[in-house]
Amino acid sequence: MEFFTLEYESVGCFHDKSNRAISGGSVDYHTDLIKSCYLKAKREGNEYFAVQDQRQCFTSPSAGKTYSKYGTASGCANGKGGSWKSNVYRITTGILFIFQYQTIAGGRYIVL
């Protein structure tokens, strides 16, 4: 179970190429793309993340230095990028708690 506040800001829309501006590979999310990508970046301790083509998520420790290597773009749709276009976000603040319940003697306890 997770409790979190979403704290991020849009940096803008940027071009991308097959030699990705943000290294580390991508993960596809088909629901809650921006939230899912934010959580992935937060869990990995990264400050920047990008979403592309309505389903792809990119994040890496060096993303803040590399996201703009191919220049700014227009045509990112609904904050979720486009074909070879990334909407880039920067995590500003936020707290992420991940915990699990354990059942002990019929009671539930939170394990942090």
Label for each model-derived stretch:
Residues 1-112:
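Peripheral, non-catalytic regulatory segments
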